[in-house]
């Protein structure tokens, strides 16, 4: 028997405890973390989840995510790894790529996909790194108008997103009166700005994008067109909203929103023949594959998260089923039912409705704002988020609430259920107005929260609504792992 390296005999009891630690279930090994997870599980079970970017992953996805694939390091790409022992990791990644192309009906001769991005933000930054030189120019929908931080957000005084720090960003806007994207203004600004990349993507925009118009603007300016379909990727897979693939050079996405997978990202890119010279017949081919793959690894990331790639692969298989397509149709139907119910209760919904999974409710006509309403609704077990509305003067006091239907649709809610949800929201906003009247319209959010927490009459009203909400929510099963 070889002597221990440290010259001391191994403590058999200590080593036995080590082996026990490795085999213990979470509830025995770390009761603090276990209890936090249980509390969060209960919050999800008894509450109404209306955050548009959230969903409930299936048991199969979560099982893949918690598998032994977490243990394996595999820098590089299939067949070109920097580590040994990657035979099955290669098999998994190739399967995930194949399913990603299949779910969107893409020809592998014309499209490729990178499934290694850790999430949507790194995926977007990898595209910019690949296609836009440092300090090159990009155009994305402004964050206050429904865009995303990673599309180049900055204020008059500060560059907020890393995208705006390392690249020159000019946002495009919506029409403040209609809430629709102002494509004419975008076209004029692009002619003056000469972007290298135009981003067709949103985080709070309830209408379909005009990809054909965006592609024409890109072509007129020699720019690439990239779609960030993170919010609508599941809807695109089911064919219930227009696909960006017909018009875009590159498409990025997360995998955990409407696609209902785990948290990860994907980048699709065109390949093959880009154009043919009509005089000589000479072909020009896309070179996006090497640029994007190099930007992901080794440019911005190290080893891929193989457990997440497994979860994505499972979600992609589920997304090719008839039941998934039925689910996505119901997401849109539920969103329209929610919009109609709220408008019937006197609320203004930006753009007057929705083509997808979310709506933006403008509370200015009610005399309050999204921050206050969000806090009261949260106290009533309704989760949503404050959001700027077109024409808002300050992002610090946004006027709107963003509401989405994917998560609750996964729990089985239908149109009539969302009508009831709308009435819960209405009662929560009425409570918001009562508290605001008591504390004063000019009070800070902190003062508003102190009033919410300190006044007995408000406590009773919130508790009564919360009890009704939780009684209603628990009628619907929560997907996921048993025991959590």
UniProtKB/Swiss-Prot annotation:
Its cofactor is pyridoxal 5'-phosphate. CDD domains: SHMT (cd00378). Pathway: One-carbon metabolism; tetrahydrofolate interconversion. The modification N-acetylalanine is found at residue 2. It is an enzyme of class 2 (transferase). It holds the Pfam family SHMT. The keyword Protein biosynthesis does not apply. Keywords: Acetylation, Cytoplasm, One-carbon metabolism, Pyridoxal phosphate, Transferase. GO terms for molecular function: glycine hydroxymethyltransferase activity; pyridoxal phosphate binding. It catalyses: (6R)-5,10-methylene-5,6,7,8-tetrahydrofolate + glycine + H2O = (6S)-5,6,7,8-tetrahydrofolate + L-serine. Its EC number is 2.1.2.1. It is found in: Cytoplasm. The modification N6-(pyridoxal phosphate)lysine is found at residue 257. InterPro entries: PyrdxlP-dep_Trfase, PyrdxlP-dep_Trfase_major, PyrdxlP-dep_Trfase_small, Ser_HO-MeTrfase, Ser_HO-MeTrfase-like, Ser_HO-MeTrfase_PLP_BS, SHMT-like_dom. GO terms for biological process: glycine biosynthetic process from serine; glycine metabolic process; L-serine metabolic process; protein homotetramerization; tetrahydrofolate interconversion; tetrahydrofolate metabolic process. Gene3D superfamilies: Aspartate Aminotransferase, domain 1 (3.90.1150.10), Type I PLP-dependent aspartate aminotransferase-like (Major domain) (3.40.640.10). The keyword Transferase applies. One of its GO terms (cellular component) is mitochondrion. Signal peptide: none annotated. PROSITE patterns: SHMT. Belongs to the SHMT family. Interconversion of serine and glycine. In eukaryotes there are two forms of the enzymes: a cytosolic one and a mitochondrial one. Homotetramer. Identified in complex with ABRAXAS2 and the other subunits of the BRISC complex, at least composed of ABRAXAS2, BRCC3/BRCC36, BABAM2 and BABAM1/NBA1. This is Serine hydroxymethyltransferase, cytosolic.
